[in-house]
Amino acid sequence: MKHILLSLSLLSSSVLAQDTSLHDYLIDGEPWKEAASGYAFTDGLCCDAAGNLFFTDVKAGKGIYKIDVATGKTDLFLDNLPGISGLQIGPDGRFYACHNKEQRIIAISMMGEVEVLLTGVKCNDLVVSKKGHLYFTETPTLSVHLITKDKKHLVADAGHVQKPNGITISPDERTLAVSEHGGKHVWAWRIEDDGTLTAGAPYMTMWLPVGKETAAGDGATTEVSGRYFVTTELGVQVFDTAGRLAGIIAKPDPLGKVVSVEFAGKDHDILYIAAGEKIFGRRLKVKGYFGQP
């Protein structure tokens, strides 16, 4: 019954589900292009309103890096913040980060001033709503957490998602989606007015590699029409608003790993992925939700 109610909630949003395929997303002659290289383990992709891309190097990085939207040049943007795995710019213009190395959730001003929001958590990835509610995944404890706009901490869900990892939100901010690293589903919940989660269900089913029982779901993001992009062992799996798989965007390196995904660029139509030591991007027919005014 919860799954049915959630389905009706999604279908009654401003975006109606349609049958789609990758032809609705991909542009002929637009392959993956290397955007940055020379890192140990890139992660934490996020963007700002101008379309600049920010990322981290979890294993060996010094802080937050920036790929400039105008020049394509990569520079260290904020120093002395090693070990960040999840990153997003919130409605107040600050970075919000899963500082996994220090087991804490922090907010960081563009000048590098740090506010500690929560400690003692093995956080992985996060998303922040326009209302200011922050949701993050804690993979080892199989839990999804909420820090409300009033800075109250709640465990929003526990024990259901198999190794929760990537996390994103629908454009109407009524649905939260979380990928399973240790399973084959992307879970979805209805977001109530107070930020709490209800009606959780395994809403999307990821394709599995041959002979494996897990899809290794990782990073996740959303485009403006409400479709979900999730990194997996097979590539970037794309789901429509009804939870149907539209297809899989192949990885730049068939043997490589992709962990984080985000739209950026001047028109927010370049899909970027964190792939080990490199960042790749490719222009699509659709635009990302995050960073939009």
Question: Which residue stretches match the model-derived regions?
Answer:
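A short beta-strand motif characteristic of beta-propeller blades
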Residues: P31-A36, K73-L78, E113-L118, K152-A158, ...
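Short loop/turn segments immediately following beta-strands, especially the blade-tip
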Residues: W189-T196, L284-F290
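Beta-rich, blade/repeat-based domains predominating
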Residues: S37-A50, N80-H99, Q103-R104, T119-F136, ...
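Beta-propeller domains
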Residues: F55-D75
